[in-house]
Amino acid sequence: MCQSAIQWIVFYEMFRIFTQTNRNFMVTYFDVCEILEMLSEASVKVFLDGGWGVDALIGRETRTHNDIDLFVEKKDYCITISVITGKGYREVIMDYTTDSHTVWKDDNGRIIDMHCFEYVEDGILYDGYIFPSETFSGKGNIGNIEVSCINPEAQVQFHLGYEYDEDDVHDVLLLCRTFNLEIPEQYKTHI
């Protein structure tokens, strides 16, 4: 093995150890790649939502993330749970846990916020609501991994109607500026 390859491996391993021990329970770029790859290997199609979904649409990581939000089709839900529990994730019951929205955490503090949906004649059924089919038409990248995600317009709509935080403000303003979308009224005070 050449010297530069050995140096790269040593650097990568040191960086990986550093991020594992000093990340305050964040889901890093490397974590996202690992999660996406393990689900892809199980032939599970996922759609990114939330902060990582925004960053995928933008094409780069724009902030830190405490979780990864994934939408999976109902037919793939059991295999998805089997894959992630096989990697050490356990369900964490939250106030908002439903049959279609669960949270999973591993011993390293990585959190997967799992959303289960199904395709219906009128669109996409999630948590008792029907959304337009194009909701999942977003395309983006996490590094060199092409991903499907919630489209920019739906991402902005999903950030309405609740008490938002600074990450929500960051995400909405970034989406609106990047994709030339109108900034929602409740976010205009942050311009």
Stretch-by-stretch model annotation:
Residues 8, 14-191:
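Compositionally biased terminal segments of proteins
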